[in-house]
Swiss-Prot record:
<dbReference type="GO" id="GO:0005737">
    <property type="term" value="C:cytoplasm"/>
</dbReference>
<dbReference type="InterPro" id="IPR008880">
    <property type="entry name" value="Trigger_fac_C"/>
</dbReference>
<keyword id="KW-0697">Rotamase</keyword>
<dbReference type="InterPro" id="IPR027304">
    <property type="entry name" value="Trigger_fact/SurA_dom_sf"/>
</dbReference>
<dbReference type="GO" id="GO:0043335">
    <property type="term" value="P:protein unfolding"/>
</dbReference>
<dbReference type="InterPro" id="IPR036611">
    <property type="entry name" value="Trigger_fac_ribosome-bd_sf"/>
</dbReference>
<keyword id="KW-0143">Chaperone</keyword>
<keyword id="KW-0132">Cell division</keyword>
<keyword id="KW-0131">Cell cycle</keyword>
<dbReference type="InterPro" id="IPR046357">
    <property type="entry name" value="PPIase_dom_sf"/>
</dbReference>
<dbReference type="Pfam" id="PF00254">
    <property type="entry name" value="FKBP_C"/>
</dbReference>
<dbReference type="Pfam" id="PF05697">
    <property type="entry name" value="Trigger_N"/>
</dbReference>
<keyword id="KW-0963">Cytoplasm</keyword>
<dbReference type="GO" id="GO:0015031">
    <property type="term" value="P:protein transport"/>
</dbReference>
<dbReference type="InterPro" id="IPR001179">
    <property type="entry name" value="PPIase_FKBP_dom"/>
</dbReference>
<dbReference type="GO" id="GO:0061077">
    <property type="term" value="P:chaperone-mediated protein folding"/>
</dbReference>
<dbReference type="GO" id="GO:0043022">
    <property type="term" value="F:ribosome binding"/>
</dbReference>
Amino acid sequence: MQVSVETTQGLERRLTISVPAEQIENTVKEALKSEAKRARIPGFRPGKVPVSVINKRYGNAIRQDITGEVMQRNFIEAIIAEKLNPAGAPTFTPGSTEGENFEFVATFEIYPEVELKGLESITVEQPTAEVTEADVDSMIETLRNQHATFEVAERAAAEGDKAKINFVGSIDGEEFEGGKADDFELQLGSGRMIPGFESGVEGHKAGEEFNIEVTFPEDYHAENLKGKVATFAITLNEVQAANLPEVNDEFATLFGITEGGIDALRGEISKNMSRELEQALKANVKEQVLNGLVEQNDIELPAALIDGEVEVLRKQAMQRFGDQAANMPELPADLFTEQAARRVKVGLLLGEVIKANELKAEDERVQALIASMASAYEDPSEVVAYYNGNEELMQNMRNVALEEQAVEALLKTATLTEKAVNFEEFMNKATGRA
C-alpha cells in the first residue's frame, strides 16, 4: 500500500492510497464463486450456476461492495500509519480497478491540535446564597396559589383574580392576526400577557367595556409586532376571586406529608429548595468557567462535528413538538449552527483539560450525582438501582462527573471572587423568570 497525504485547507486532509488491484480482483472472484453455489436461477441446478452468469447478473454490485470494503480497510490502515485522527466519516473517490494498482482518494477532516491558553485569565464571580424562612414562606404562598379555588366575585378585578374577557387588538386602527379572542381566561398578575395588559384589566368590573394601550416588547416573537403600540378593545365578562387554602396540617397532606404537619412540610420544602439552589449555583459557576475557557482559546472546528451536532439539536427541537413534528417542515440548520459550534468547541477544550489533568470519573462522585438526582423521586432507591443496572445511563453519569472534575480543575487556576446574592432573585434569573 502506498499513501500520500495532502493538506487541502484548514483541517481537511486528502489521502491518496494505492493498493494492488489483485486485492479487489481476487476477492471478487471468490465472491462470485460463493454466490454461484448459493444462487437459485431458473434453468440451472442449485449450485451449478456458471460464474459467468453470476458475473453478468450481480458482478457490478459485488464489485462495488468489495471495492468499498477494500477502501475502508486500507483507509483505516493508512490513518493509523500516518497518525491521523479523523473527525467524521471520509468521502471516498475510487479510481479505476484496471491495471496493476487500484488508486482511490479519501477526503476527511482531522481533529485540531488543542493547546490550552489563558487559563489563569479566567475570572469567576462565585455567587453565594442560602434558603431563608422568608423564602420558604414565599414558596408556601406559591403552593397556596397553585391549589386555589375560584368563585365569581361582584367587585373590581384585582391581581390574583381570574378574568374572563373578550378582546380585539389593533395597530393604527387595523386588526392584526392572533390579536382576537372570546371568553379568554386570564389570571391577573401571572405575567402571561405582554407588559401592561393584565394591569390594564385590574380595577374594572364584569360587564365593562374599555380600551387599553400597550407596547409589544422589542424581543417579541412575532416580527411584525416587535416594538409596536397596540390598542386592545376589551369586554370583561366575569371576575373570579381566588380562595386560598389555609396553611394547616390538612394543607400539608396535599404534598404527601402524613406526619409532622406544617413543620414537616416546611422542612421538606427547605430541603428541596436547598438542593435546587446548590444545583443552580454550580451551573452558574460552570457557565462562567466555560465562557472564560471559550474566550481564551480560539481553535479551528471540524465542520463535520458541527454538522453532526446540528443534527442532534435539530432532532431534540423536533421532539419538543411531539406529534405535531410529523406535519412540520425540517427546521433550517442555521437555527442551530452557532449553538452547535459552541458545544463542539467546549467539548474539544474540556477533552484537552481532562487529558492534561489525567482525569478519570470518580466512582464516589458518580454515585453522589445519581443519588442527588434520585432524591427528587418518590422512591430514590429504585432510581439508583435502575441507573446502576443500565450501562448507557451510567456512562452518561460518568461523563457528567468528568465534566464536573474538569471544571474544578479549571477553577484551581481561575480568579474567584465571592458575591452574596438573594435566593429568589438568583433562582428567578437561573430559571429564566427574571
